[in-house]
């Protein structure tokens, strides 16, 4: 509140609160209006202190008055409020806002200023007629006149409020979208830097974006100063100086100087245009940041409508900062490339460079029927989440009765208080001073002696946090002593003396009381025998008691203690007895006017009080974690455990609590997760496991910081190596305190002899999804700092495993490793001695490491009589792991054994090929293999070898020694080419080399240069591969056929085709040659694609060594031009074998049904009896329909079942429909109740038109006069026929009339008018006016009267033209929207009723009823419920449905904690 509330004194505030907002209203001004005004000042670059004086208010009025006529409601309210404040400061008696505004207009001479402005405008307009030079208009034709020439002088004309208002509206609506840059260019054309700064200053709510623009301005200004250094020496008298960067930005230059630089300087420097370019650069950067999605990332979803994808694509294109040529290339290549597979198949069939209209037309059905189901599913999900939020909001406790802040009585608010206004402190609540002068704060005190001697300081200790959550502050629970490193017991602090009542004191035995923090830690202490209720404050240095609670005798010294709120005079009594629990201590007591009694550290420290937390380093940063949006924590019951496991869990938890890694909690935490334990590998110890599956579902998603395991072949060769392991890695990193409550778990008691012991984690727990990522990130940041200090060491980290190498001798290396361990220990990361490996071989991540070589840990293949799917999976996994060092391993036939099998325990029958492959692999593994380390600067060579069965093997070598090996299998394609597989293998090699060594290898491939280049010349676009060296290795044999690019002369041409009847599955295939040779065969149980391929096979069989083949099948063309060498299709294999035998083959595709000679003849031969044409008889009817209604081709195609090309041809033959092409119909995103209305003129008559924005449905008629009465009648007609909730019109007098306003009030219609400088405001109605006139022009000859033509045109537009969303007519679309809305409302009602029920359910054979869950759906035999974030299905017999009548309260709600409601609790 600050200065805003101090703008008026008490007397002025009383007068201010008696002024009414409106002359006839009851509401009056309140303090909240002053607070709001203070915050609004920042938007206009004004200080809120200006509200405190009459002169300040006058300055504010001068700024706001030009903007008030066209300003927003908020700006007008601020202007009115400042006028009222001006009158209050001036002691003018006013009753309401209107009187204040009238007084301000007279006092500030605003009326005279308006008259002078009108007079100047009149003189300027008359001067323009007389003076040819007149006003300098910017070249873009903008009406923002920056200056006017009067004689030889230039006078600045500021921007109009309308221009500023349009700029503010544009920014508020577009939010720095791609449209904001052209909008700024249009509005700022010809402006001076002063005008541009004024445009930036009105954007008060976008400080982040303005800061980006400011940084760009500073950079460009610095570049300008470097490129234009100032001249040496002083300037001659009268010469205008050159502008600097700050001058161009308008910070160090006046408006007159800017005008002189622009218009009169020699040479002229257009500082306004230069500054505009700088601002545009900044705005473009803002647009990029506010629209972070790149056009490369715009991809069509599987069920997304193609039109929606196009809209997103072009929106991203507009935000891209690229040239027009680049954007054109992006549109042509990416729009089709990033479409979903369904649309991509359709778009590729359109040929090269299809138009956008053709693409939208072809793909308009994608996402249609299923899109509605998707919307309904999302709505259902939203309703569920809203219902959960509403139910959650009802769990809070009831609000207390209202209390007056002025008099302190209950039952009324401050604004209703009849007593005089009291000036009261907002912090302590006492009268007589303001909050800024308050001295009664409880803060971190520090002693300031009166005599000015040196300040006393108390010793500082580590702050730790231990277990809390006892049910009462008076309950005492013994706890083990904190670690000795934290605080030494019995150590006194600054003159305090400690005395124990007995040797059996709990504090002397190393046990102290624990206090919960769910309420204030207040205890009863005895000071000189007087019981005092005091707050135990570890943050306060001193003990201070209220004068009313304690009166001490004896000598005292005056002191001043300082806090944030100021100094406080106290009395200091030294050496006073204080008894806290069983401890009797002597120390210093301060007596003063404190709001609450405080026991500080001078008493708590000698008493042995400590804040105990786990052994988690306070230096380690805490990573904030939260739940997913709308998710809640786990509420799972603990399942039964055996006595042995309960005892083991209790021992583990006692140790973890002693180390501070977990903390005890009480029943106020409502969350719980089941816990259990298992025996470790050595069977001597237990391991605690917590089932965090439910919490993992609700926790936010994380990204794995480390994406793979470091490979030993990528390590450099080191003379010394050490392998470390961080013990209890997760337990070393603290967990976000706000998230700890969700990790709560319970250890039950045997036979339920007592309540279970509850804990929560203070560190990262095992099994939680966030632990790996947080640990990786935290450990990496710690090691980064250590690496800078221990530069001789090379440290490689993967999770908690560390590989440390160096080139030092053994002694130095061990010393550096010990330093590393000490530094890790200082951060709280321990490295146990038993996990430190100092001698080779080192076991690390499944490898065996030596300083000069590495191996894979021994792998043994089992011999079993019976193998299951799970056994085969484990076997293949072992072989894949071994393949990185053992060359020649194969798994293709082993994988075939489990293809299609899903049950892991299903028995597998071995094939002969798999047994041979298994035996070969066993022989390979018998020979021990080893790899070497990487030598920087030496080239890496990759040798590729082809194995049997389409499998490949490769080796990475360096100086003849093997770094690593691997294997590769062909992709899962039906038709493959080994050269394409080889290209994929090379890509894999290069990617693997870049990941491990960061460089590309020299490739040795089994292929000849000429053979590869012959294939690569035509198929280079299939993938990217690097350059390689062709070496003398066994070449890949050429087993593919040759396709020529030009027809083979003097050879016969075979036109092939095939056809199939879809019902009978019978077909024909054949060919016809240019010399008349032909052959046609009948086929059974075939398809169109198979028939096309069979025709090609027949042509190959009957032709010579050279052949020309022409087909109209893109399917066959696509397969054969890829030159496959093997295929899973027998027919393709036969065609490949025939083509390999040919010397030359020319294969060409032509479009079908285009009248091409041989193709048309063979098509007739194979189509006879197969294909039928059913639409010919409908063409004549369609032509008659179009001559009457002139409907578009979509309507003709749907109504009469015509192909699109036939329907388009009918429209093209009509002379009246060839004025312009067919428009692409698109609809804006609007609700079903939004209409736009406008008046247009035709043949001297007024036509009023209304359009339903979402559907394009129009209502129109001729009205006698353009008046409010006629407009209201027409509006009533629409209201009586269609649902209308919002009406948008322009600012015409008939639309803003009282008749229309009354009709909108009666019909509950929201009426909005057009926005200046916003071309989209009335876009729908303007487009419909144009279309309506075009239709009328086509049918005007058929009717006598204009009124008839208008109604006929409405009928044609609404019922005879299809397009837009769903390919429907506007009438169909409107009815569909209304029906859909009714269905959704009905569905919402059903969902709401269902969600009011709760379900208790049983799972499997578990007799315990669980729940309650939320009922989502109920059928005859099953129900679907929601438990947590999962949807589950249960049989009806295992579910009980009840109605939830009353919301339940949980102890974990924050509203149940004392102190959560404020200081009064």
Swiss-Prot record:
Residue numbers binding Mg(2+) 2: 1057, 1092, 1112, 1163
Write out the entry's keywords from A to Z: Aspartyl protease, Capsid protein, DNA integration, DNA recombination, DNA-binding, DNA-directed DNA polymerase, Endonuclease, Eukaryotic host gene expression shutoff by virus, Eukaryotic host translation shutoff by virus, Host cell membrane, Host cytoplasm, Host gene expression shutoff by virus, Host membrane, Host nucleus, Host-virus interaction, Hydrolase, Lipoprotein, Magnesium, Membrane, Metal-binding, Multifunctional enzyme, Myristate, Nuclease, Nucleotidyltransferase, Phosphoprotein, Protease, Repeat, RNA-binding, RNA-directed DNA polymerase, Transferase, Viral genome integration, Viral nucleoprotein, Viral penetration into host nucleus, Viral release from host cell, Virion, Virion maturation, Virus entry into host cell, Zinc, Zinc-finger
Positions bound to Mg(2+) 1: 725, 800-801
Which residues carry the site feature described as Essential for RT p66/p51 heterodimerization? Answer: 1015, 1028
**Residues annotated as domain Integrase catalytic:** 1228-1378
Known post-translational modifications?
Answer: Specific enzymatic cleavages by the viral protease yield mature proteins. The protease is released by autocatalytic cleavage. The polyprotein is cleaved during and after budding, this process is termed maturation. Proteolytic cleavage of p66 RT removes the RNase H domain to yield the p51 RT subunit.
Catalytic reaction list: Specific for a P1 residue that is hydrophobic, and P1' variable, but often Pro; Endohydrolysis of RNA in RNA/DNA hybrids. Three different cleavage modes: 1. sequence-specific internal cleavage of RNA. Human immunodeficiency virus type 1 and Moloney murine leukemia virus enzymes prefer to cleave the RNA strand one nucleotide away from the RNA-DNA junction. 2. RNA 5'-end directed cleavage 13-19 nucleotides from the RNA end. 3. DNA 3'-end directed cleavage 15-20 nucleotides away from the primer terminus; 3'-end directed exonucleolytic cleavage of viral RNA-DNA hybrid; DNA(n) + a 2'-deoxyribonucleoside 5'-triphosphate = DNA(n+1) + diphosphate
Q: Where is the Reverse transcriptase domain?
A: 659-849
InterPro entries linked to this entry: Aspartic_peptidase_AS (IPR001969), DNA/RNA_pol_sf (IPR043502), Gag_p24_C (IPR045345), Integrase-like_N (IPR017856), Integrase_C_dom_sf_retrovir (IPR036862), Integrase_C_retrovir (IPR001037), Integrase_cat-core (IPR001584), Integrase_Zn-bd_dom_N (IPR003308)
How its function is modulated: the record gives: The viral protease is inhibited by many synthetic protease inhibitors (PIs), such as amprenavir, atazanavir, indinavir, loprinavir, nelfinavir, ritonavir and saquinavir. RT can be inhibited either by nucleoside RT inhibitors (NRTIs) or by non nucleoside RT inhibitors (NNRTIs). NRTIs act as chain terminators, whereas NNRTIs inhibit DNA polymerization by binding a small hydrophobic pocket near the RT active site and inducing an allosteric change in this region.
Q: Where are the zinc fingers (CCHC-type)?
A: 402-419, 423-440
Q: Where is this region: Disordered?
A: 116-144
User: Domain notes, please?
Assistant: The p66 RT is structured in five subdomains: finger, palm, thumb, connection and RNase H. Within the palm subdomain, the 'primer grip' region is thought to be involved in the positioning of the primer terminus for accommodating the incoming nucleotide. The RNase H domain stabilizes the association of RT with primer-template. The tryptophan repeat motif is involved in RT p66/p51 dimerization.
This chain belongs to the protein called Gag-Pol polyprotein
Organism expressing this protein natively = Simian immunodeficiency virus agm.vervet (isolate AGM3) (SIV-agm.ver)
């Amino acid at each position: 509140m600050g200065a805003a509330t101090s703008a008026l004194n008490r007397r002025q505030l009383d007068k201010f609160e008696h002024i009414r907002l409106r002359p006839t209203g009851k509401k009056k001004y309140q303090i909240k209006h002053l607070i709001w005004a203070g915050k609004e000042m920042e938007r206009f670059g004004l200080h809120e202190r200006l509200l405190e004086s009459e002169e300040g208010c006058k300055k504010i009025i001068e700024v706001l008055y030009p903007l008030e006529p066209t300003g927003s409601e908020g700006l007008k309210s601020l202007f009115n409020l400042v006028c009222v404040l001006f009158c209050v400061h001036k002691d003018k008696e006013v009753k309401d806002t209107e009187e204040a505004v009238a007084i301000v207009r007279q006092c500030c001479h605003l009326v005279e200023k308006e008259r002078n402005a009108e007079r100047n405008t009149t003189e300027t307009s008359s001067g323009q007629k007389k003076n040819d030079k007149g006003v300098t208009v910017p070249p873009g034709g903008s009406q923002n006149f920056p200056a006017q020439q009067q004689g030889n002088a230039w006078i600045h004309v500021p921007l109009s409020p309308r221009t500023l208002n349009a700029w503010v509206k544009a920014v508020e609506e577009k939010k720095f979208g791609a449209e904001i840059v052209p909008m700024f260019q249009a509005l700022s054309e010809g402006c001076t830097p002063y005008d541009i700064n004024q445009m930036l200053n009105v954007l008060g709510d976008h400080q982040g974006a303005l800061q980006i623009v400011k940084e760009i301005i500073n950079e460009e200004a610095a570049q300008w100063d470097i490129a234009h250094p100032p001249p040496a020496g002083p300037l001659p008298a009268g010469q205008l100086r050159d502008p600097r960067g700050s001058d161009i930005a308008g910070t160090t230059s006046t408006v007159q100087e800017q005008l002189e630089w622009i218009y009169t300087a020699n040479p002229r420097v257009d500082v306004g245009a230069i500054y505009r370019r700088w601002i545009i650069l900044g705005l473009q950067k803002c647009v990029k940041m506010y629209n972070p999605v790149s056009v490369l990332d715009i991809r069509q979803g599987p069920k997304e409508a193609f039109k929606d994808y196009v809209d997103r694509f072009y929106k991203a294109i507009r935000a891209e900062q690229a040239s027009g040529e680049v954007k054109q290339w992006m549109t042509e290549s990416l729009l089709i490339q990033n479409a979903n597979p369904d649309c991509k198949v359709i778009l590729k069939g359109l040929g090269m460079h299809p138009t956008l209209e053709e693409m939208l037309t072809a793909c308009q059905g994608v996402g249609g029927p299923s899109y509605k189901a998707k919307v309904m599913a999302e709505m259902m999900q939203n309703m569920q989440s809203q219902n959960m939020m509403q139910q959650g909001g009802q769990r809070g406790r009831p609000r207390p009765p209202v209390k007056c802040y002025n008099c302190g009585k209950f039952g009324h608010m401050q604004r209703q208080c009849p007593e005089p206004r009291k000036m009261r402190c907002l912090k302590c609540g006492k009268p007589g001073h303001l909050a800024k002068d308050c001295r009664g704060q409880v803060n971190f005190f520090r002693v300031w002696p009166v005599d000015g001697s040196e300040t006393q300081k108390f010793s500082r200790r580590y702050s730790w946090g231990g277990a809390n959550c006892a049910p009462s502050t008076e309950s005492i629970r013994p706890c083990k002593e904190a670690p000795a490193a934290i605080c030494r017991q019995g150590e006194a602090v600054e003159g305090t003396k400690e005395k124990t009542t007995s040797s059996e004191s709990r504090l002397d035995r190393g046990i102290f009381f624990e206090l919960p923090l769910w309420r204030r830690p207040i205890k009863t202490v005895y000071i000189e025998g007087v019981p005092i209720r005091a707050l135990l404050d570890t943050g306060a240095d001193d003990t201070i008691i209220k004068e009313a609670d304690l009166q001490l005798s004896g000598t005292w010294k005056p002191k001043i203690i300082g806090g944030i709120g100021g100094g406080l005079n106290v009395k200091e009594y030294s050496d006073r007895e204080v008894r806290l629990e069983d401890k009797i201590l002597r120390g210093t007591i301060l007596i003063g006017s404190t709001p609450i009694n405080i026991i500080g550290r001078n008493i708590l420290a000698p008493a042995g009080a400590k804040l105990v937390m786990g052994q988690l380093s306070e230096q380690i940063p805490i990573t904030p974690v939260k739940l997913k949006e709308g998710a809640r924590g786990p509420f799972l019951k603990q399942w039964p455990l055996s006595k042995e496991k309960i005892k083991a869990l209790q021992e583990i938890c006692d140790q973890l609590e002693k180390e501070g890694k977990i903390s005890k909690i009480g029943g106020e935490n409502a969350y719980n997760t089941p816990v259990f334990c298992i025996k470790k590998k050595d069977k001597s110890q237990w391991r605690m496991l917590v089932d965090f599956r439910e919490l993992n579902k609700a926790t936010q998603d994380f990204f794995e910081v480390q994406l793979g395991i470091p490979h030993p072949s990528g390590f450099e060769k080191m003379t010394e190596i050490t392998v470390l392991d961080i013990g209890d890695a997760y337990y070393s990193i603290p967990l976000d305190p706000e998230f700890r409550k969700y990790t709560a778990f319970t250890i039950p008691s045997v036979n339920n002899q007592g309540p279970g012991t509850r804990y929560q984690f203070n560190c990262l727990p095992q099994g939680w999804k966030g632990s790996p990522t947080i640990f990786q990130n935290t450990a990496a940041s710690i090691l980064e700092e250590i690496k800078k200090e221990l530069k001789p060491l090379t440290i490689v980290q993967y999770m908690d495993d560390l590989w440390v190498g160096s080139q030092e001798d053994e002694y130095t290396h061990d010393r550096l490793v010990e330093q590393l361990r000490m530094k890790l220990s200082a951060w709280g990361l321990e490295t146990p001695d038993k996990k430190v490996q100092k001698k080779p071989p080192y076991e690390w991540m499944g490898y065996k490491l030596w300083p000069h070589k590495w191996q894979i840990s021994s792998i043994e293949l089992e011999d079993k009589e019976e193998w299951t799917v799970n056994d085969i999976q484990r076997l293949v996994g072992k072989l894949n792991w071994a393949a990185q060092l053992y060359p020649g391993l194969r798994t293709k036939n082993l994988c075939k054994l489990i293809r299609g099998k899903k049950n892991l325990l299903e028995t597998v029958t071995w094939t002969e090929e798999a047994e041979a492959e298994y035996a070969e692999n066993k022989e390979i593994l018998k020979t021990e293999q080893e790899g070497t380390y990487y030598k920087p600067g030496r080239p890496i060579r990759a040798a590729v070898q082809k194995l049997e069965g389409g499998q490949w093997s490769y080796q990475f070598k360096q100086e003849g020694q093997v770094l690593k090996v691997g294997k590769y299998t062909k992709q899962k394609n039906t038709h493959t080419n080994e050269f394409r597989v080889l290209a994929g293998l090379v890509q894999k090699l290069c990617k693997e080399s870049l990941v491990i060594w960061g460089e590309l290898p020299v490739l040795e491939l089994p292929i000849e240069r000429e053979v590869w280049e012959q294939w690569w010349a035509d198929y280079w676009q299939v993938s990217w591969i690097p350059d390689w060296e062709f070496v003398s290795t066994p070449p890949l044999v050429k087993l593919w056929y040759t396709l020529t690019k030009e027809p083979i002369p003097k050879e016969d041409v075979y036109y092939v085709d095939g056809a199939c009847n879809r019902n009978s599955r019978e077909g024909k295939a054949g060919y016809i040659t240019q010399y008349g040779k032909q052959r046609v065969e009948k086929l059974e149980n075939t398809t169109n694609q198979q028939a096309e391929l069979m025709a090609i096979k027949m042509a190959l069989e009957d032709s010579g060594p050279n052949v020309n083949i022409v087909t109209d099948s893109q399917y066959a063309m696509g397969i054969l031009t890829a030159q496959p060498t093997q295929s899973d299709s027998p027919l393709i294999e036969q065609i490949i074998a025939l083509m390999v035998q040919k010397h030359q083959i020319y294969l060409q595709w032509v479009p079908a049904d285009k009248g091409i000679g041989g193709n048309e003849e063979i098509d007739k031969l194979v189509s006879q009896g197969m294909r039928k044409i059913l639409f010919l008889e409908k063409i004549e009817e369609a032509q008659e329909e179009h001559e009457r209604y002139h409907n578009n081709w979509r309507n003709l195609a749907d109504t009469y079942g015509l192909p699109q090309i036939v329907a388009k041809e009918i429209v093209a033959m009509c002379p009246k429909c060839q004025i312009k092409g067919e428009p692409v119909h698109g609809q804006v995103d609007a609700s079903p109740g939004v209409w736009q209305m406008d008046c247009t003129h035709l043949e001297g008559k007024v036509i009023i038109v209304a359009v339903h924005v979402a559907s394009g449905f129009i209502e129109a008629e001729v009205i006698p006069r353009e008046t409010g009465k006629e407009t209201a009648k027409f509006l009533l007609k629409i209201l009586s026929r269609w649902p209308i909730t919002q009406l948008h019109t322009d600012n015409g007098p008939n639309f803003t009339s009282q008749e229309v306003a009354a009709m909108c009030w009666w019909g509950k219609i929201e009426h909005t008018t057009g926005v200046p400088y916003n071309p989209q405001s009335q876009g729908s109605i303007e487009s419909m006016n144009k279309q309506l006139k075009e239709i009328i022009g086509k049918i005007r000859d058929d009717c006598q009267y204009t009124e008839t033509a208008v109604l006929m045109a409405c009928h044609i537009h609404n019922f005879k033209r299809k397009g837009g969303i769903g390919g429907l007519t506007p009438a169909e679309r409107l009815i569909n929207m209304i029906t859909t809305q009714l269905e959704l409302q009905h569905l919402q009602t059903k969902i709401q009723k269902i969600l009011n029920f709760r379900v208790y359910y049983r799972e499997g054979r578990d007799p315990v009823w669980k729940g309650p869950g939320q009922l989502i759906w109920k059928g005859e035999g099953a129900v679907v419920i929601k438990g947590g974030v999962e949807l589950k299905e249960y049989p009806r017999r295992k579910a009980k449905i009840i109605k939830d009548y009353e919301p339940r309260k949980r102890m974990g709600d924050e509203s149940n904690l004392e102190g959560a409601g404020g200081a009064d609790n």
